[in-house]
Swiss-Prot record:
Chief site of localization: cytoplasm
Protein family membership: Belongs to the chaperonin (HSP60) family.
Name of the protein this chain belongs to: Chaperonin GroEL
Cellular-component GO terms for this entry: cytoplasm
Subcellular location: Cytoplasm
Function (record text): Together with its co-chaperonin GroES, plays an essential role in assisting protein folding. The GroEL-GroES system forms a nano-cage that allows encapsulation of the non-native substrate proteins and provides a physical environment optimized to promote and accelerate protein folding.
Entry-linked PANTHER family: 60 KDA HEAT SHOCK PROTEIN, MITOCHONDRIAL
Length: 546
């Protein structure tokens, strides 16, 4: 297929047109008074959203060069959301403003490479000032404020997220699910839970709830399949002398071994239960080690030179309470050494930092949560499917932004933090580097201006008023008042502001230093020819019908 090449100003102007269209669609969602965007779906009802990244993801333009510009900024919005959970609209507004200012200067003859260098220096200096101005998230109230703002000022969602984080800690896993009704709910699972239930319902101790509960129990951990009773008989005899219940976690327990355990359980000889080990392959081995660390036990594995026949009671883990239903096993109050658990947590955190796979990262974070806190499930309720999807997206974003706030701290919100940081930056640059520096200094005013415009105020007037003051002074777009942003609880995670600015400068630099674009030429398909009508004999005789 033939391809068309566009050069210099012609290419950059078309790229800018794509960025402008994306920006115009996304910017309306910004701030507490942001508007909704209605998105047509390929099937079913259209979706309504105030989430910038959800709008950006839907945009495809007909002009191939303009579409390339839009797709690059869309990628920035997505990466900002992935890294910080919020700030997608901020990143888009910044990218557009930087590109617009930069394009004007480059068209007038500025050197793109020098301009880029000045932009990078300005952004780095502003980020350093943001870090200095940030403060650590103190308590539940500040977490509620961050979550509320990220959930588009929904205080109920903010409170749910704060409650969840309080219960499972900053390393705990918080998942978001759809509720069956219209009310929002929070469920918290204490201890370590994995998705394996009892191997036989005859292990049940509570017939009403259909659960097996073992108190002050031993835990046998092995990566072997147990099919013969003689494999575990010596260990069973030793635990019977101790008079404590036993949970067996193995690759599988089948045949004679399972039958014998069930019969002895029913006769009251053994207080026992058995479940399959969680996970598969290498992940199963790691999860067994996690349980061993949590309970102070040892995985009995032939790889380590250990066999079930020769296993001692010292190899068994211990837990205060174990609850098993048909789908899940929960281990509460594991008796492992706290130092061993901390070491294991640190090891998993290192693996999370080094892995590039999103799937592996998610599974590692689940393991981390099970070791360090627990799992909280926020169940989102809504009256319709459209409302449910929109609300669930907001909760996901608010959750990520709140974690970002806990991780790196908070700054004043409402677009004021960037302006305050810029007021403290004074770089002595020359020529086109100075042009790049000034581009950033003007562009960082755009988020505050857009928040004000969406709330029905004059963006320029609001920016000028905020610039006259120092400290935590900013603009509350919800009521149109100038306030102390920290006192009013209008705050943003530092990580969100930092990543939004870094990503915006990065993509704008790429676009401004683009000198050519290459795209396929769409071949217009010729319209199908009219079918040959033939003679259509007999038509001439129609005159007699007059």
């Amino acid at each position: 297929m033939a391809k068309e090449i566009k050069f210099s100003d012609s290419a950059r102007n078309l790229l800018f047109e794509g960025v402008r269209q994306l920006h115009d669609a996304v910017k309306v969602t910004m701030g507490p008074r942001g508007r909704n965007v209605l998105i047509q779906k390929s099937y079913g009802a259209p979706s309504i959203t105030k989430d910038g990244v959800s709008v950006a993801k839907e945009i495809e333009l007909s002009c191939p060069v303009a579409n390339m510009g839009a797709q690059l900024v869309k990628e920035v919005a997505s990466k900002t959301a992935d890294a910080a959970g919020d700030g997608t609209t901020t990143a888009t507004v910044l990218a557009y403003s930087i590109f617009k200012e930069g394009l004007r200067n480059i068209t007038a003859g500025a050197n793109p490479i020098e301009v880029k260098r000045g932009m990078d220096k300005a952004a780095e200096a502003i980020i350093n000032e943001l870090k200095k101005a940030s403060k650590k998230v103190g308590g539940k109230e500040e977490i509620t404020q961050v979550a509320t703002i990220s959930a588009n000022s929904d205080h109920n969602i903010g409170k749910l997220i704060a409650d969840a984080m309080e219960k499972v800690g900053k390393d705990g896993v918080i998942t978001v699910e759809e509720a069956k009704g219209i009310e929002d709910e929070l469920d918290v699972v204490e201890g370590m839970q994995f998705d394996r239930g009892y191997l036989s319902p005859y292990f049940v101790t509570n017939a009403e709830k259909m659960t097996a509960q073992l108190d002050n129990a031993y835990i046998l951990l092995t990566d072997k399949k147990i099919s013969s009773m003689k494999d575990i008989l010596p260990l069973l005899e030793k635990t019977m002398k101790e008079g404590k219940p036993l949970l067996i976690i193995a690759e599988d327990i089948e045949g004679e071994a399972l039958t014998t355990l069930v019969v002895n359980k029913l006769r009251g000889v053994l207080n026992i239960a058995a479940v399959k080990a969680p996970g598969f392959g290498d992940r199963r081995k790691e999860m067994l080690k996690d349980i061993a660390v949590l309970t102070g036990g040892q995985v009995i594995s032939e790889e380590l030179g250990l066999s079930l026949e020769n296993a001692e009671v010292e190899f068994l883990g211990k837990a205060g309470r174990i609850v098993i239903d048909k789908d899940n096993t929960t281990i509460v109050d594991g008796k492992g050494h706290s130092d061993d658990v901390k070491d294991r947590v640190a090891q998993i955190k290192t693996q999370i930092a080094s892995t590039t796979s999103d799937y592996d990262k998610e599974k590692l974070q689940e393991r981390l949560a099970k070791l360090s806190g627990g799992v909280a499930v926020i169940k989102v309720g809504a009256a319709s499917e459209v409302e449910m999807k929109e609300k669930k997206d907001r909760v996901d974003d608010a959750l990520s932004a709140t974690k970002a706030a806990v991780e790196e701290g908070i700054v004043i919100g409402g677009g004021a933090a960037l302006i305050r940081a810029a007021q403290k930056v004074h770089l002595n640059l020359h020529d086109d580097e100075k042009v790049g520096y000034e581009i950033i200094m003007r562009a960082i005013k755009a988020p505050l201006a857009q928040i004000a415009i969406n709330a029905g105020y004059d963006g320029g007037v609001v920016v000028n008023e905020v610039e006259k003051h120092e400290g935590h002074f900013g603009f509350n777009a919800s009521n149109g008042k100038y306030v102390d942003m920290f006192k009013e609880g209008i705050i943003d995670p530092l990580k969100v502001e930092r990543i939004a600015l870094q990503n915006a400068v990065s993509v704008s630099s790429l676009l401004l230093t683009t000198e050519a674009t290459v795209h396929e030429i769409k071949e217009e398909k010729a319209a199908p020819a009219m079918p040959d009508m033939g003679g259509m004999g007999g038509m001439g005789g129609m005159g007699g019908m007059m």
